[in-house]
Amino acid sequence: MDYGFSRKTVVILAITVIAGLVVYNVAPTQIEPGQYQLTLEIHSESIYTSQTYNVSFVSEVADDSIEYRLNGTSTNVTVTITQSVEITPDNPLQITLEAFGDDLSANEIVATLTDNESFNLTLRPNRQSGQTFIIEYQPLVNSQSAVMILTVVAILWFSEGISLVATSLLIPILIVLTDIRSPQTALAPFFDPAVALIFGGFLIGRALTKYELDKRLALLILSRGEGSGSSLILTVMGVTAFLSMWISNTASAAIMIPIALAVISRIRSVDVRDKYGKALVLGVAYSATLGGVASLVGSPPNPLAATYINSFLGVQFSFMSWIPFGLPVVLIMLPLIWRWLIFRFKLPKGIEEMNELKEISYKEYLKLGPMPTEQKLVVVIFISTIALWFTEKLPDFIAHAIGWSGHGISSAVVALIGGLSLMILRLLDEKDVSSGISWSSLLILGSGIALGGAMIDTGLSSFIALQMSGLGIFPSFLVVIIIGCIAVLVTMVASNTGAAVILIPIAIPLATGLGIDPLLIVMVIAIAVSMDFALPTGTPPSTIAYSTGKVEMREMVTTGLIVDLIAILVVTIIVVWLWGFFGLVVL
């Protein structure tokens, strides 16, 4: 084993240190203590008013609030303002408006904070519950340290000068050393509900692969399938995507690639075998990556997004809540990718040898034998876990019909119950836990939540969002497309979790400032960061597909770039319209 640093690592670390020092010195400093003017405007048919209040930002301990009442023709509003704000992390200026009478909407409320000199800031409601609107502004605090940490982490994540795990461990260390958060607060995200959910999902996925239930399911479906040639690719892609909803995309690709290779080997024509091999192998890779966006446990950015939605948007976002957002993406993109692969590699409509796949799959299925007791127990736990995930919080129309809104146990706790059950029944042992869990993914996810929290606590995310406020000159639908493109581009040079960590904390204040539904922007980013299909190094399924030797680098890049384009159009236009049509987001 080689110890020490390679020349590349030394260069990257040197660049990282220099960049960190430079941005620390040029980064915006924290807000100056003093008195500011807050102008609150409400423009609606039932109340039209503009009021100015004094607000102080101070260095010493302070927590003074005052309440005002604004009267309109048919709407009255009670306003509570924090008039004296201590300049510390996670201590925002808060304005609460409670309306009585005719309904107000968030876009009818705007606040302006100014010092009558160079500081001028426009604020809009961050959260809404019924007719209660909350405007929060976290002023810049420890901003130079926050910018330095973000720069260092971004360089190390993008360049992989040190391992992603090492960078993940560096994040809480820097957060504590720069006095942004206490050790308890900085380390708490490493077992955040999002991390616990993925951890429990990994345990269940490990049980499925250990007892070959995933392989059994895949062979069972393929042995019952019909069709040949190009239609068979769609079947294989559908099975792969379904598996990827519940187990890691790496595991689903690892299961389906050997099946695909066995199918390819049956084709006698060299030319047809070559074209079919490229399409089938890429189809497996793409669907393994795509399937992860369909469920909350399918990909780490999903629970990360849910964490921010629950914490900062005041929305109870459950496992069931994710399905109508993620599943349509898969259902729309899967056939589009399939048609593109057929066109790209000019596949014949039917291939005689593919009629044998049903027989091949059935023979392989029979080799597995009858289900032993262990497999049956895993199936029971798996189905029970899914049932509990779906019934955490039922849709309102179902809840009203049956008189039960759901059991209310969080998805993370349900996942842990499922994992614990597997260990109590000795279906999993310590070796399974140590070898079957992607600990690096959990560390990256936990550190990402810690970094995002630091960006929000120091006001950095709001500051960056304000610098992007120029996007307001564009229509909202175009802003959504731009943000989707940015997410896809960032994930081409960083992991999907890293991309989500950087973009989502910025997206919430950006959307609020532009008058766009923050839930819409968060969901677009969470899904778009999992849409990297162009590079072999982009996702593990792409790496596995490339390692088969069936597809060349040039072919993978050119084919994948079109899939990336399809993904951007589907996620930012078609699916967003569906979300709005069914009332999931406000367009």
PLM segments and residue spans:
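Membrane-embedded alpha-helical segments and adjacent helix-loop junctions characteristic
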Residues: 152, 165-166, 170-274, 434-514
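A short, solvent-exposed beta-strand micro-motif common in secreted/extracellular proteins
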Residues: 93-99
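Membrane-interface alpha-helices at helix entry/exit sites of multi-pass transporters
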Residues: 227-235, 268-282, 316-324, 515-520, ...
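Membrane-water interface of transmembrane alpha-helices
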Residues: 209-213, 255-262, 341-352, 537-538
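Alpha-helical transmembrane segments and, especially, the helix-loop junctions at the ends
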Residues: 202, 242-257, 275-319, 333-342, ...
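Interfacial segments of multi-pass membrane proteins
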Residues: 174-178, 306-314, 510, 550-553
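C-terminal transmembrane helix pair
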Residues: 269-271, 327, 446-451, 455, ...
